[in-house]
UniProtKB/Swiss-Prot annotation:
Keyword terms of this UniProt record: Cell projection, Cilium biogenesis/degradation, Cytoplasm, Cytoskeleton, Developmental protein, Glycoprotein, Methylation, Secreted, Signal
Positions where Omega-N-methylarginine occurs in the chain: 486
Function statement: Component of the tectonic-like complex, a complex localized at the transition zone of primary cilia and acting as a barrier that prevents diffusion of transmembrane proteins between the cilia and plasma membranes. Regulator of Hedgehog (Hh), required for both activation and inhibition of the Hh pathway in the patterning of the neural tube. During neural tube development, it is required for formation of the most ventral cell types and for full Hh pathway activation.
Residue runs in coiled coils: none
Organism: Mus musculus (Mouse)
Full protein name: Tectonic-1
Gene this chain is encoded by: Tctn1
Glycosylated residues in this chain: 41, 303, 536
Family, as annotated: Belongs to the tectonic family.
GO cellular-component term (any): extracellular space
Gene null: resulting phenotype: Null animals show disruption of nodal flow, laterality defects, and neural tube dorsalization. Basal bodies dock to the cellular plasma membrane, but fail to extend axonemes. However, cilia are present in the notochord, early gut epithelium, and mesenchymal cells surrounding the neural tube and in the limb bud. Null embryos develop an extra preaxial digit on 1 or both hindlimbs. Although sonic hedgehog (Shh) expression is normal, downstream signaling is disturbed, suggesting that Tctn1 is required for cilium-dependent Shh signal transduction.
Domain of life: Eukaryota
Length: 593
């Protein structure tokens, strides 16, 4: 009997058995016939193979991995890259990858300036173009090879076929034609004085436990908003009330405000309570509040006289009528905050100083001043003699250096850092011992006294006594070059040159009689706002032979301070005239040189 096909019922049972079975049958790859394009398009019947069908897969059976297709074509063609092609539509000398060069140009090349051109070295496999010159051939010609390079690194890029990712996209510049379309795609924009970030977003991260430099000062209460406001001018001279005060940023602003005299009682910016009512948070996002204490209130009248108000409360603007004119009193003119902070970044105390005044109906623009200063708690502010240059009439900042490389040590008494002998009505040097006067910048001073001598005082002891009288207890070694020079910045201090002058008489006792101090200073900075800077300090101690012996002798002791301006005359600065910096091409004289 010839072979017959299986009965239809048996085939159905076999299919049901294989679809419900959980056994996985591995089929060798060699037994799987290769499927070509012709097989897929063919309409001929193929012989039936007695094996389980893989198309009906149960949910628990893993899918066989699919074979990946061919690699995409790289978007970067290294054969078309040329980094030495600088001249457009011209052949660059010794640039073997220049597409503008012909075989005749290659024949006169001496070498290839760029022998290897590669793409991104982070790829696992990349093309590399090698260029070389065959100078032994006649005529010389260029050799080109394109090879594959393998990156041995484990972390490498397999393939990159997304061309837009290889360069930055040019943003579309808004104009009158595409502005509406860009507004629709971007979703528009909003301007709001308050932060649009939800309050829940701030609670996700760790809460700050201190204020950092430049952080806005947070306040409690809805009347003043979230931050302490310090009005300031923005694009114009008008006051903008949404400027937050920043931690450790001392600022001073002056701006104008449009005022309607009939509405002055209802304007918060003119009320004293608007600036004293906010409570500053000791640290950000805390429950501890620091109230603002009113330290002083000055009242300025219409004729600009100032009067300090005592025992006052919170004054509010009040509109009064005086004949045909209407006045608004208790209007805030100046606001000054003084904040004490600790080294841990906390607000310790807040003070407020105000200047109130009267506003007339003839004034439509009100000038207001706002200041804020930060002072560290537990430290006393050091008075300065200028910022940065010296101011006339302020004492010189001086001190001494205990050892080389250390900072300058100053006394806490600013008036006693650099002093000279003070003249008294008695003109007695011994009676005026210990009385000193500070050296003030810009003031030429001369002082003196009389010393009555007797024959019982030895000359050596007397000379030391007079020298101590002229120099004082602590004569400084350094003087600050600027009025705000810091003690740790030794380069900003000028040494005091102490010179002693005495007669040439041998065998005689030299008695100091005069101390001449010369301070040379110059104008530093811009001509519009020059700053006084000390450049040299010289102290000359003049000694003379002891007077002839006698029952009673009188010696005049004097001290002089002179300030000398050594500023160079101002010269106008001009820009240097332009010069021609032309260079010939590298092969200009080729082949002669």
């Amino acid at each position: 009997m010839g072979s017959r096909g299986l009965p239809p019922l048996l085939l159905v049972l076999l299919n049901c058995y294989t679809s419900s079975s959980t056994q996985v049958i591995a089929i060798p790859a060699a037994a799987t016939p290769a499927v070509t394009k012709e097989d897929l398009n063919s309409t001929k019947a193929t012989p039936t193979t007695l094996q389980p069908s893989l198309s009906p897969r149960t949910p628990g059976t893993p899918r066989a991995p699919e074979r990946s297709g061919p690699r995409p074509t790289p978007v970067t063609d290294v054969a078309a890259l040329c980094v030495c092609d600088l001249l457009p539509a011209q052949c660059d000398v010794n640039c073997c990858c220049d597409p503008d060069c012909s075989p005749a140009d290659f024949s006169i090349f001496s070498a290839c300036s760029v022998p290897v051109v590669t793409g991104d070295r982070q790829f696992c496999s990349q093309k590399a173009a090698f260029y070389s010159m065959n100078l032994t051939a006649d005529p010389p010609h260029r050799d080109f090879k394109l090879i594959d390079q393998i990156n041995p690194s484990v972390f490498c890029i397999h393939i990159s076929n997304y061309k837009p990712a290889l360069s930055f996209a040019n943003p579309e510049v808004p104009d009158e034609n595409n502005f509406d379309r860009l507004m629709q795609t971007s979703g528009g924009f909003t301007l709001s004085a308050e932060s649009a970030v939800p309050s829940t977003a701030a609670s996700d991260g760790p809460q700050p436990t201190k204020y950092e430099y430049g952080a806005p000062l947070q306040t409690a209460g809805a009347s003043s908003g979230s931050f302490l406001k310090l009005p300031s001018p923005l694009t114009s001279s008008l006051c903008a009330d949404q400027n937050p005060a920043a931690f450790l940023v001392s600022q001073a602003f002056e701006c104008s405000r449009r005022v309607d005299i009939e509405q002055c009682e209802g304007m918060e910016a003119l009320s004293m309570a608007h600036y004293s009512s906010p409570a500053i948070l000791r640290v950000p996002n805390s429950m501890t509040q620091v109230s603002i204490k009113i330290q002083s209130v000055m009242y300025r009248s219409l004729n600009h006289t100032l009067t300090q108000l005592e025992g006052h409360g919170v004054l509010r603007p009040s509109l009064v009528s005086t004949g045909q004119d209407r006045l608004c009193s208790n209007v805030v003119l100046q606001v000054k905050y003084s904040l004490l902070y600790t080294a841990t970044g906390q607000i310790h105390e807040a003070g407020l100083s105000l200047v109130l005044g009267t506003l007339s109906s003839a004034v439509s623009l009100l000038q207001q001043k706002f200041e804020i200063h930060f002072i560290q708690h537990g430290t006393k502010p050091v008075p300065l003699s200028g910022n940065p240059g010296y101011r006339v009439g302020l004492p010189l900042a001086a001190g001494f250096q205990p050892q080389k490389g250390s900072g300058i040590i100053q006394t806490t008494n600013r008036q006693g850092q650099f002093t000279i002998l003070r003249s008294t009505s008695q003109q007695d040097c011994l009676a005026s011992e210990g009385l000193r006067t500070p050296v003030l910048f810009g003031y030429n001073v001369q002082s003196g006294c009389q010393l009555r001598l007797t024959g019982t005082i030895p000359c050596g002891l007397l000379a030391q006594k007079v020298q101590d009288l002229l120099r004082g207890q602590a004569f400084p070694d350094y003087v600050a070059a600027f009025g705000n020079s810091r003690a740790q910045d030794v380069q900003d201090w000028v040494p005091v040159h102490f010179v002693t002058y005495s007669s040439n008489m041998k065998g005689s006792c030299q008695l100091p009689v005069a101390l001449a101090i010369e301070v040379k200073w110059t104008k530093y900075g811009s001509l519009l706002n020059p700053q006084a800077r000390i450049v040299n300090v010289t102290a000359q101690l003049v000694s003379v032979p002891e007077p002839l012996p006698g029952p009673e002798r009188t010696v005049v002791i004097s001290t002089a301070v002179t300030f000398v301006d050594v500023s160079a005359p101002a010269e106008a600065g001009f820009r240097a005239p332009p010069t021609i910096n032309a260079r010939l091409p590298f092969s200009f004289f080729f082949p002669f040189v």
